[in-house]
UniProtKB/Swiss-Prot annotation:
This is Uncharacterized RNA methyltransferase CPE2114. S-adenosyl-L-methionine binds at residues 286, 315, 336, 381. Belongs to the class I-like SAM-binding methyltransferase superfamily. RNA M5U methyltransferase family. The active site is at residue 408. GO terms for biological process: rRNA base methylation. Keywords: 4Fe-4S, Iron, Iron-sulfur, Metal-binding, Methyltransferase, S-adenosyl-L-methionine, Transferase. [4Fe-4S] cluster binds at residues 71, 77, 80, 160. PROSITE patterns: SAM_MT_RNA_M5U (PS51687), TRAM (PS50926), TRMA_1 (PS01230). InterPro entries: MeTrfase_TrmA_AS, NA-bd_OB-fold, SAM-dependent_MTases_sf, TRAM_dom, U5_MeTrfase_fam. Its EC number is 2.1.1.-. Residues 1-58 form the TRAM domain. One of its GO terms (molecular function) is rRNA (uridine-C5-)-methyltransferase activity.
Amino acid sequence: MRKGNEIELLVEGIEFPAKGFGFVDGLKVYAKNTFPGQKVFGRVTKKRKEYAEIRVSEVREKASYEEDQKCPHFGVCGGCSSQTIPYEKQLELKVEQVKDLFKEAEVPTGEFLGIETSPIQWEYRNKMEYTFGDEEKGGELTLGMHMKGKSFGIVNVDKCVLVDEDFRNILDTTVKYFREKGLPFYKIMPRTGYLRYLVVRKSVKTEEILVNLVTTTQIDFDLTEFTELIKGLNLKGKLKSIIHTESDALSEAVIPEKVNILYGDDFITENLLGLNFKISPFSFFQTNSLGAEKLYSIVRDFMGAADNKVVFDLYCGTGTIGQIAAGKASKVIGIELIEEAAMAANENAKLNGLNNCNFIAGDVAEVIKTVKDKPDIIILDPPRSGVHPKALDYVIKFNAPQIIYVSCNPKTLVTDLKVLETKGYEIEKTLLMDMFPNTPHVETVVKLNKK
């Protein structure tokens, strides 16, 4: 077997995140987003002594348990990977992958409590970031998601089933309008064009909708007609905000260099477990609101009785976990790298009448050195890269009786848990939460106690 060869592979097992594997001539071969029982065909993209990887071009045989796809974009759009897998099987595979990581790292799970299901499997997302582009080079304007296995192709996802019909309506109306106007989309190379992204957010409890059109400054285009068009849509939810963000940044991330409010406010409000949270166009907020309520309830339950206790909420984002914990604690201190998020956290705490919370902007690894309070409980909710080693050192030095680790990446989770174990922490229990049905992702919540 050599790089560039095309081979057929029977998928026999799976490793996180949904990397199926089988064996060809005794060599372990990985195929991303495949599942046990499938027979796939693809090209070898990497060949090592111990393993190889292929990019799948065709699923030649489905697994016996697979169902028909629900979405017409499945297989072309890169958004979903497990839509044909029955939900109970998705959960089973996620549990298997996470438990295998713990076993491989020789980290105990403590009492393993299984996996909590998402309250809804479809139309659960409260945010979508759509990209302007074309499906084929030189083709008509499209607005949607990156095509599976391609660097530049964008597929229209006007029938996506991860969002409700308001998202689909806004997307369809927007792309048709800008096709009619003949405006060019932004091309990464040679960095020319106007239309970049359309970001839509919708809160579940209040049903408020925010629409954010992101463009470059290369064309001076009057968006009054577009604004009136969106305002005139027959939406189930309540249109609260239309924003125009101007960004000439080289980064593919939405970087707001100038923000213009075309209609309404610059935020929407979501309610979680009785608390209100203002969400700006750029706020980090869990994309499954109903799932977030379950996730944060798990954290609150893991805390147990927290009266008269000081809680640290590290990597706190807009302070959702910290504020939900505040009802049980005497004091909450949150640390968040992004200044805008920390400011929003303090604003939300004030909005909710919580005077026992303080959210600080800065790098966790640096700010944590300056905090004088001694925590009874530390809540860790780091990015996919895990807790920075310097920050983890300070977490350990605080010698908190209890740590609750909320992880979106079980690979970095087990690495950090191994360190905490060597420093005198014992894992009491582990529970998974499926926040992202039909995708490989899963949240893991672990409670640790100081021996």
